[in-house]
Amino acid sequence: MKPVIALIGRPNVGKSTLFNRLTRSRDALVADLPGLTRDRHYGEGRVGERPFLVIDTGGFEPVAKEGIMHEMAKQTKQAVAEADVVIFIVDGRQGLTPHDKTITDFLRKSGRSVMLVVNKAEGMKYTTVTADFYELGMGDPYVISAAHGDGVNDLVEEALNIAFAQRPPEEEAPASNDRSIKLAIVGRPNVGKSTLVNTLLGEERVIAFDLPGTTRDSIEIPFERDGKHYTLIDTAGIRRRGKVFEAIEKFSVVKTLQSISEANVVLLLLDAQQDISEQDAHIAGFILESGRALVVGVNKWDGLTSDRRDEIKMDLERKLSFLSFAKTHFVSALKSSGIGPMMKSVDGAYAAAMSNLSTPKLTRALIEAVEHQQPRRKGSIRPKLRYAHQGGMNPPIVVIHGNALEAIDANYKRFLEKHFRETFSLVGTPLRIELRSGKNPFSRSEK
């Protein structure tokens, strides 16, 4: 399980800047306006070989009673509850404020490990920038500049050390078939995940094992369907009650992200009785960014009028067009309708994600693509695409070598992606294209 780090602090202390540096993204909007980040933002980071999840929160006012600041306080409290370590950020330029003291009181009661971090400390002596903050009684502060990156790596290394040190030893996971497909079923609350889980895990097909006792554990449930082996990855709290498994529907973004990161294939479940929501799109976006193979299931399809079905299909095309590489199935988990074909698509998506693409075939496909459509010139320079090879699986990565490839635009990369998909029947998996300019090591004339 990846450690979870929450970034907490009053408005405008640099939480989003630190989030962007940790995740190497611009996902959270950054500007000098208090309260600009309205909701929790989630991202993946990595220090060396150690991955982690990071939560960026809105500016925290624990005692806010109404309005947007009240909603942001609720979101922040949830982030603290989900975190292994809390990084409490204060502003070294402004010094200690009453607001910082209020947040300290809340964090002290939370029971979480808290690291006090003084940001915006560039050009200032440690003793000068930290002096006021000892009053908070949270030990020696860490000093960083999120904008310039000073001290950030050391901070995260220590946060991860704390997170791992406080975790209990991991119990041995239940035995599963090495060839099984690890499947995560994700979606917002009440779309029917628990019903689908029970349909897939019919008691006669479940391999018996002891469930971990805490919802923070990752649960792996091996099962077999139509002769195929799967392992259901669940961190949302599946519990045995009597003779059935019951999935708790309480939605947790962190647990959803953990499930996605541990899976081979993700089944995104939507509710046909409701329009596609912003939350649906956010989950879909993270699946895409994670590079996981994907199947979309639209549940509660039975009983809908033809007009409503048309509306849902249009909604899918409009709001989730970036998932066009994945197959969509219209199902009823309650009546077990359409489940078989959907699971066949799970198998197909996994096979596509694990495709072994030979260098000669990739290079041939690349040459065919260039013959069909050459990249545009950039000024006097036209990119030369020479050969391609596979750079990884799950998702497949196609590495293209040539000259002046930095001049290739996003439209041409999409054209190449589409061509490789069609050539190698890559349905249900993201496909990454990497461009590398330089000499062809296989060319005798360039040795």
UniProtKB/Swiss-Prot annotation:
A Gene Ontology biological process term: ribosome biogenesis
Superkingdom of origin: Bacteria
Boundaries of every KH-like domain copy: 355-439
Protein keywords: GTP-binding, Nucleotide-binding, Repeat, Ribosome biogenesis
MF annotations from Gene Ontology: GTP binding; ribosome binding
InterPro entries: G_ENGA, GTP-bd, GTPase_Der, KH_dom-like, KH_dom-like_a/b, P-loop_NTPase, Small_GTP-bd
HAMAP family cross-referenced by the UniProt entry: GTPase_Der
Record-given protein name: GTPase Der
The organism of origin for this protein: Janthinobacterium sp. (strain Marseille) (Minibacterium massiliensis)
Encoding gene per record: der
